[in-house]
Amino acid sequence: MFRRNIITSAILLMAPLAFSAQSLAESLTVEQRLELLEKALRETQSELKKYKDEEKKKYTPATVNRSVSTNDQGYAANPFPTSRAAKPDAVLVKNEEKNASETGSIYSSMTLKDFSKFVKDEIGFSYNGYYRSGWGTASHGSPKSWAIGSLGRFGNEYSGWFDLQLKQRVYNENGKRVDAIVMMDGNVGQQYSTGWFGDNAGGENFMQFSDMYVTTKGFLPFAPEADFWVGKHGAPKIEIQMLDWKTQRTDAAAGVGLENWKVGPGKIDIALVREDVDDYDRSLQNKQQINTNTIDLRYKDIPLWDKVTLMVSGRYVTANESASEKDNQDNNGYYDWKDTWMFGTSLTQKFDKGGFNEFSFLVANNSIASNFGRYAGASPFTTFNGRYYGYHTGGTAVRLTSQGEAYIGDHFIVANAIVYSFGNDIYSYETGAHSDFESIRAVVRPAYIWDQYNQTGVELGYFTQQNKDANSNKFNESGYKTTLFHTFKVNTSMLTSRPEIRFYATYIKALENELDGFTFEDNKDDQFAVGAQAEIWW
């Protein structure tokens, strides 16, 4: 189109000149004719250049150029243009139309980052996620993970877990907002090349919709700033990242809740959720569905002193059983449901040089206490892998945790996860009813910071647990792990920055295995493994 316009303009410009030349042809010499043609050609080229420059201006975006910066020595920093076009620092954005009485430019400068955020906010859609994936091999056969929840994750996990969240704003007017949120999570197998969900060796590939809910703001007169949600969603999870389990977790099939409700100096989170369970009989072959409901209440972000906040939490789970379900428990060998609760507190300290530490105290009874007694994964579930069973007699368990990271000087950082637990008269999934247990697990991860993008360090893990059954027989489980690693990072924080690519060499040894009888390949009690793993969230 642009070339066609140029050609048309040239013809129109040449036409009158050609007519004039024809009328004077008989009275002009050859030299005079050539001079006239050269003059006309120069004028035509000048006009064409003018039109071309105007067309370029129409399609060139306005940018705000930055002045050349100088370094400490006074020299211009990178004064020469590179072969690759540089992004402009800012764009000019047209503001709302001004009234005749207003003065000033109707354009304002906006950085590309701000402009990108503006477009994203205007669309109202976001896509967030997490996954990990990697390769590993071991000294004898396929590498195996063991006691991740006690020995730590580095060089000890071979899964491909993922979370993918889609969020769309559907309304945002008059101080009211509505968002639709869907989250999928699951695992992609890292052993076989094929990974069809639900149709693979070992059932390693699976996926579910863990969240599907609507969240709003501004609809509750008494809490306009709070997030009010309805749907498949639970209260926020709090994780001990180095051990890959949660100190606070309330799974939900569906529910209703309120988050970040400002009351006094802190904020309240409250959720009422449904989570039905499969109640098994003594043979663990037959099951019945029992409807249970959970109330989860937290008062958080209570300021104590500078950079220190407190949270107080409580959770209660009760069943809504039918007459036939109770009859099966009384007469057909199904395990009786027992209500279960957990309450506690946590304190979070942030450090001036970066980093933090979180301390928590939790106490629970019945089936939640049973999960306190697990050495591998110790999240506060009400079931064991989705199955409810066992003689729960009101026994209790206590858990003390510490996790965090701290910078030591300019080139060292240390992360930690330490857990001490004990319980009395609980149902243990390894040693049965009326069991007592005591355990300690500790993982420390110091590293040398080369720069923003590189760290080299070691993760050291150790745990020991002793269970005592109803007959006072003692069962011990213990082990240790040493992992040397180098990581490629985008920031120096170990626990709060991703993406991260890590290369590792791990030696892991089971000292005692009287609770689970675990062995590595070839019935070995130890394993040496090397590998690489990527972990990312966005």
Swiss-Prot record:
Gene3D superfamilies membership: Porin, LamB type
Signal peptide boundaries: 1-25
Keyword check for Amino-acid biosynthesis: no
Chief place of localization: membrane
GO terms under cellular component: cell outer membrane; pore complex
Highest taxon, organism lineage: Bacteria
Family matches, as InterPro entries: G_neg_Bact_CarbUptk_Porin (IPR050286), LamB-type_porin_N_dom (IPR021570), Porin_LamB (IPR003192), Porin_LamB_sf (IPR036998)
GO BP annotations listed: monoatomic ion transport; polysaccharide transport
Membrane topology: Multi-pass membrane protein
Keyword Cell wall biogenesis/degradation assigned: no
GO molecular function, a single term: porin activity
Keywords, alphabetical: Cell outer membrane, Ion transport, Membrane, Porin, Signal, Transmembrane, Transmembrane beta strand, Transport
UniProt-annotated location(s): Cell outer membrane
Purpose of the protein: May be a sugar porin with a broad carbohydrate specificity.
UniProt protein name: Putative outer membrane porin BglH
